[in-house]
């Protein structure tokens, strides 16, 4: 069975965030790997720690205002209402990856304002 990379990429483009998240977990389980970014080795003793340049926003809990959280997730991710609901129901889940510190803090503040619990990674 020959794999056509372009075909696979096209199929992935049409997948929802929830479907892509499920795919990543299935690959991790099947191959015994992790999708986490590799951690840089510690520098020389006494060296200044490098500032983090990109952040992932993880929804830990929707809290009591679930409808408001779904609305914010829908707006932030561009997902359909149903996909946004599935994403919120699947918490804890990473909502957005690779955001700048300002973007990540802005999304975190919006979600926390309506009672959600959010962590930045």
UniProtKB/Swiss-Prot annotation:
Keywords: Ribonucleoprotein, Ribosomal protein. Coiled coil: none annotated. One of its GO terms (biological process) is translation. Pfam families: Ribosomal_L12 (PF00542), Ribosomal_L12_N (PF16320). The keyword Amino-acid biosynthesis does not apply. It comes from the Bacteria. GO terms for cellular component: cytosolic large ribosomal subunit. One of its GO terms (molecular function) is structural constituent of ribosome. Belongs to the bacterial ribosomal protein bL12 family. Homodimer. Part of the ribosomal stalk of the 50S ribosomal subunit. Forms a multimeric L10(L12)X complex, where L10 forms an elongated spine to which 2 to 4 L12 dimers bind in a sequential fashion. Binds GTP-bound translation factors. Forms part of the ribosomal stalk which helps the ribosome interact with GTP-bound translation factors. Is thus essential for accurate translation. This is Large ribosomal subunit protein bL12. It comes from Lactobacillus delbrueckii subsp. bulgaricus (strain ATCC 11842 / DSM 20081 / BCRC 10696 / JCM 1002 / NBRC 13953 / NCIMB 11778 / NCTC 12712 / WDCM 00102 / Lb 14). The gene is rplL.
């Amino acid at each position: 069975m020959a794999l056509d990379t372009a075909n696979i990429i096209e199929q992935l483009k049409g997948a929802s965030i929830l479907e892509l998240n499920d795919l990543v977990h299935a690959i991790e389980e099947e191959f015994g790997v992790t999708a986490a970014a590799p951690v840089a080795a510690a520098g020389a003793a006494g060296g200044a720690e490098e500032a983090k340049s990109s952040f992932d926003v993880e929804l830990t809990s929707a809290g009591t205002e679930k409808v408001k959280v779904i609305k914010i997730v829908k707006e932030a991710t561009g997902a359909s209402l149903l996909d946004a609901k599935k994403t919120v129901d699947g918490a804890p889940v990473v909502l957005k990856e690779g955001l700048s510190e300002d973007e990540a803090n802005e999304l975190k503040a919006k979600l926390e304002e309506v009672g959600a619990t959010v962590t930045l990674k």
